[in-house]
Amino acid sequence: AIIKSENDHIDWYDKNKDRPYWETYREYLKSDKQFSPDAVSALDKTTDMMMRNIEDPNRKGAWDSRGLIVGSVQSGKTSNFIGFLNKAIDAGYKKIIILSGLNKNLRQQTQLRIDEGLLGYDTAFMKNGVRDFKGPLARKRMILNLKPIHSATNSKINGDFKFTAAEHFMNIHTDEPTVFVVKKNKSILESVIKYFLNAPSVHGVSVESKPFKIKGHQGDYNSFIKDRPILVIDDEVDNGSVDTGEQKLNEKGEFDPEYDPKTINSRIRQILNIFEKKVYIGYTATPFANIFIHHEKKTKEEGLDLFPKDYIIDLPIPSNHSGLEKIFNIEKVDGDVIEDREIDDNYFFNIVKDNSLYHDDPDCAEGWMPPRHNRYHVPKYEYKNDDEVPIPPSLREAIMSFILTSACRNFRGYVEDGKSMLIHVSKFQDVQDIVYKQVSDYMDVLRSRMQAGHYLHDETISKFEEIWHK
């Protein structure tokens, strides 16, 4: 589904033109990542839809394209924007910024995915711009003699953007694609701003004199990049990017142009404001904060706010996605939820009854994780044997199921692929910390019991087998 505005958009995209970066990525997904033909075809269609809604990078004059992509939780949004970026580079976009969360871990995770699916090399081993091309995607691109895609950041935990390092090696790559994977951090975003405001010396691009300030820094910059568009992907756009302050109206009924937005929102908008041609695309599973941004909000220093003024695309749910409809057995007819659907063999949702002492009492405050508890709650499930880790049987079974699932994936050749299990049972960090310790202890117990000769080895194997046959 797509919602489009009536703004000044010019149709331009021809999917029948040569798209070598996309074609090598598509072959990589099919032959090396074992994506089904249907999944690759669906990705091709949705990314074509996105390309048709942005502007031609060679379009003359000033233009500003802003959109929002909405996808279900864990439904492949990162794969989608990597596919889209391959097509954008094929079309001629050269400078790409990916805003990837508020902390270094999230940034690193995104960089690893970009290394794998867009760059084709591990940026952790990059030194002074020299890349170590290894892996199937890199080989496919080397055969076609494609230009390398440069990275201003790397996949080390502290591999975020650094102005001095980028200036050192990127000034010789004036017309080749360059990707920045950065976290939403004040100092990092200001370093990116400074880098682009030094465009005449770094890039040799056409600039126009335009006074420009960076808040908190003295002096004016005088760069306005005219002939090279910027493409910004804002991952989890509802987290950190939205201005949560109140921009009031002045006596003319207009938004106060001197208003000071929240820091991250301000710096993102300033990056966009440096460029005459710009594309900004936000990705989220929860779009409500973004669609309620007022479409006329703007300031003198930041320009327009981040409202998706041109289009909103609702990504289709992949056929292999186990989302809330499957987990909670929800059936929809014409958008309406059918609540009394009969439980069938595909019903994923397991009603947990051992989390509290009195499961049917919503006010119960006793047991391992009752519905009502505070930050001082100590989760404890009582066993006859005091040596047992105090987590309930349902969580033990869930952990063992995850171990079996991971073993299956390893057996099928996905040893290097990430595997994770989320255990989120309390809104209180202190309580979650206790649960983390309990789960870690239980993992140690399982490892011990799986050792040959342990007196509970056979019993543990039998439990795994029982879960396998469920």
Where are each of the predicted segments found?
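Phosphate-binding P-loop
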Residues: 55-66, 414-417
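Walker A/P-loop NTP-binding motif
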Residues: 78-92, 113
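Low-complexity, highly charged intrinsically disordered N-terminal segments
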Residues: 1-60, 111-118, 122-227, 231, ...
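Conserved P-loop NTPase catalytic core
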Residues: 125-139, 228-234, 243-409, 420, ...
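Short hydrophobic/aromatic beta-strand immediately N-terminal to the Walker A/P-loop
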Residues: 68-70, 97, 422
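Conserved strand-helix element at the start of the C-terminal RecA-like helicase core
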Residues: 180, 417-435
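Walker A/P-loop
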Residues: 63-81
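Conserved SF1/SF2 helicase motif Ia
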Residues: 88-106
